Amino acid sequence: MILDDIVGVKKKELEIRKESKPLKDIVDELSRIDEFKIRNFKGALINDDISIIGEIKRASPSKGIIDRKFEFEDICSTYETLDIDAVSVLTEQHYFKGKDEYLKKAKEFISKPVLRKDFIVDEYQVYESKLLGADAVLLIVRILKENLDKFYKIASSIGLQCIVEVHNKSELDIALKIEPEIIGINNRNLENFTVDLKNTENLINYMPENTAVISESGIKTSMDFKYIKSLPINGVLIGEGLMKKIYDIESIKKFIDSVKSG
């Protein structure tokens, strides 16, 4: 299964990272930084209109390479000028061709809140995310299970907000036990990467009133947006739909306008 492969590679990668830079060194480095410019990710989702999280994504297991040029600074410049509310940056190296450096640069070039999008399997990555400049991290229930509460508390203790990601009702039940501020409903099944937009509709009615809800994955056409906007959600995460238009500023602005206008 794809998710098992990703997690396996991530754990091996972390063994090397920890040898190169132990967790203690990261914590010590964090303690020496006087001030972090943390931006309010949840605040960016609380709007009268639907909020848009634009994702910077070079590749994916299902689509392969999405952007062969991947002129990162140009992408950041475009995202800064677009009418979007936050940015998600893929840092997973092997399957999504991301880099930690992309997160650091995005925080430098973009004034909007920045999410580190990766497959967090170890508390090391939570502290690392803070050091890289993330405002929020993604915690995937299917990966973390009983460790979800622990990782959520660690992130909160160092000033990071979390998107707690679920795909089905059993995962949502686990998530709701920790009363998260933000829940992401992934329309993509991480076991086989198939997509069903009905997933958001199936889970939305179980959400607590004060929880910000994001619909993730598979939102590409005007009909998709019209359908998703009919649901009581706060925001959408759009990756491929933006990245395929990223170098055509007029086209991408029309695309964003169509999402906002519904």
UniProtKB/Swiss-Prot annotation:
Keyword Transmembrane belongs to the record? no
Name of protein: Indole-3-glycerol phosphate synthase
- NCBIfam families from the xrefs? PRK00278.2-4
Return the EC number: 4.1.1.48
Give the organism the record lists. Answer: Clostridium kluyveri (strain ATCC 8527 / DSM 555 / NBRC 12016 / NCIMB 10680 / K1)
Q: Which GO terms describe its molecular function?
A: indole-3-glycerol-phosphate synthase activity; phosphoribosylanthranilate isomerase activity
What Gene3D superfamilies does the database record attribute to this sequence?
Aldolase class I
User: Which reaction is this enzyme known to catalyze?
Assistant: 1-(2-carboxyphenylamino)-1-deoxy-D-ribulose 5-phosphate + H(+) = (1S,2R)-1-C-(indol-3-yl)glycerol 3-phosphate + CO2 + H2O
Keywords for the protein's UniProt record, in alphabetical order: Amino-acid biosynthesis, Aromatic amino acid biosynthesis, Decarboxylase, Lyase, Tryptophan biosynthesis
Family affiliation: Belongs to the TrpC family.
HAMAP family the record matches: IGPS_B (MF_00134_B)
Top-rank taxon: Bacteria
Q: Part of which pathway?
A: Amino-acid biosynthesis; L-tryptophan biosynthesis; L-tryptophan from chorismate: step 4/5
